[in-house]
Every structure is written in structure tokens, then in C-alpha cells.
């Protein structure tokens, strides 16, 4: 239910199941939509004037407690106000891509520490400004078991990389960075012509190209078909494949 309470504080105790809580502070013009994974036994407290909705991941049982009077004929007057925070399309995108476990060690001990609101896919250019587009939460979680940082959502590769427009080599500063990195790695790791360097998510081969110039064998793995084609054309052997 997309709604907010102008006066009352809402408390939700999840007895069983799990859901994704989405909130937005309506009194702060700079606030963004934030998500939070709620698991059984946890209590969510929603202050007044915070828009709120839930996306359930499984059948769940919860106790919904709101301070103050609550008459059924009072809905939308002073007690509970409608506010469309999440539409059907956004809800489906989140259900499809939200990660409840660490993608490295499968731990459920994920702690969010960066929340930047909803964002369209990178370089997802529209033909017309009126065209609709997909949005996803842009948030970073920290796994307290393996210490890996990762996005809270994993957009399906086909949707993300069907026609990827970003090319790393368009930036001279980025090129220089990887040239210096290649030199440093060659010295510190004693890389030779017998070595093999594999770059997963290699884009157009910006990191591997200076290694090849040193005579070091290199292989790129790139999920975007159009970008992998460019890398191969530029002499950087690249396999078009998604690694997840």
C-alpha cells in the first residue's frame, strides 16, 4: 500500500516472511527513495510524513501498529494518505533484481551504507524525452562476513548490456591510469610473456592493451556484445560472456 501518515507513527513487526521496505521523507526536498530488507522478527518504524510501501518476497505475517485513532471511514482524510511511491513496473524490477544474499559468499549479513535513490540504467539513452524507462535502487551493501561491497540489485545482463554505450578508452586520463597500472603490475608481480592476465568486465580492453604492449598475454571477458566486438577489432582478445 503506497501511503503515508501525516500525524501518526507506524510500527510494523514482521512475524514471519520477508519484504523490501521502501520509504521517502516527504518533508525533505532532497530525500530519495530508500530500500531496506526486512526479515522475520524485525521491527520497522515509519515516522509521520514518510511515504512507505512494502514489496513482499514471500508469504508473510506482520503486526501493523499505528498510534492514534484509526477509523475505517477516516482513510485518506487525516489518518492515512495515499501516495504512489512505487508503481507496478518499479515493483517488478525490484522483485526481479534485488539481492538478499551476498553474491560472493551467500551470507545474509548485508549492511547498506550508501543510498542514492532510484536511477535509470547507465547510458540508457531515450529516443524521445517522453519515453518511459526502467529505474532501480542505486545502493551499496557491505557483507560483514566476506567484507565485499556490492550493489543491492543485479540488473539482468541482457537488459544491462544489450547495447552498452560506455567505452572506457574515450577518456585519456583513464588510459594513462591503466598504462601506469600495467607498468606497476609488471614490476611487482614479475609478469612475463609466459603470464596470462584475465580481466572480467574488460569493456573495450583499456586495461589489457598496455599489458599486450609489454608482450604479456591477456584475455578480456565482456558481457556487452557490441563492446566486445570493438575490443577484438582493436587487437584485444575478448570473450563475449557474462560472469555472475
Language model: regions and residue ranges:
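Short beta-strand His + acidic residue motifs that chelate non-heme Fe in jelly-roll/DSBH
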Residues: 2, 21-22, 46, 52-57, ...
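Glycine- and acidic-residue-biased ligand/ion/polar-headgroup-sensing regions
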Residues: 7-26
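Short acidic-glycine-tyrosine-enriched beta hairpin
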Residues: 26-48
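N-terminal juxtadomain amphipathic helix
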Residues: 95-173
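Conserved SAM-binding strand-loop segment of SAM-dependent methyltransferases
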Residues: 235-244
Amino acid at each position: 500500500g503506497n501511503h503515508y501518515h501525516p500525524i501518526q507513527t507506524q510500527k510494523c513487526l514482521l512475524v514471519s516472511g520477508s519484504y523490501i521496505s521502501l520509504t521517502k521523507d516527504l518533508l525533505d526536498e532532497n530525500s530519495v527513495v530508500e530500500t531496506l530488507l526486512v526479515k522475520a522478527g524485525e521491527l520497522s518504524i515509519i515516522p509521520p510524513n514518510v511515504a512507505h510501501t512494502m514489496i513482499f518476497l514471500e508469504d508473510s505475517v506482520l503486526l501493523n501498529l499505528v498510534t492514534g485513532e484509526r477509523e475505517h471511514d477516516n482513510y485518506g482524510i487525516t489518518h492515512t494518505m495515499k501516495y504512489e511511491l512505487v508503481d507496478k513496473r518499479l515493483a517488478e524490477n525490484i522483485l526481479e533484481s534485488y539481492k538478499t544474499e551476498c553474491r560472493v559468499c551467500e551470507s545474509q549479513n548485508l549492511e547498506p551504507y550508501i543510498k542514492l535513490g532510484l536511477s535509470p540504467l547507465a547510458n540508457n539513452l531515450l529516443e524521445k524525452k517522453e519515453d518511459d524507462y526502467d529505474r532501480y535502487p542505486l545502493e551499496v551493501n557491505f557483507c560483514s562476513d566476506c567484507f565485499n561491497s556490492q550493489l543491492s540489485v543485479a540488473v539482468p545482463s541482457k537488459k544491462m548490456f544489450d547495447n552498452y554505450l560506455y567505452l572506457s578508452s574515450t577518456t585519456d586520463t583513464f588510459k594513462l591510469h591503466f598504462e601506469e597500472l600495467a607498468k606497476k603490475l609488471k614490476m611487482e608481480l614479475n609478469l612475463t610473456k609466459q603470464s596470462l592476465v584475465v580481466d572480467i568486465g574488460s569493456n573495450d580492453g583499456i586495461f589489457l592493451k598496455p599489458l599486450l604492449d609489454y608482450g604479456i598475454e591477456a584475455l578480456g571477458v565482456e558481457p556487452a556484445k557490441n563492446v566486445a566486438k570493438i575490443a577484438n577489432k582493436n587487437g584485444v582478445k575478448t570473450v563475449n560472456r557474462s560472469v555472475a
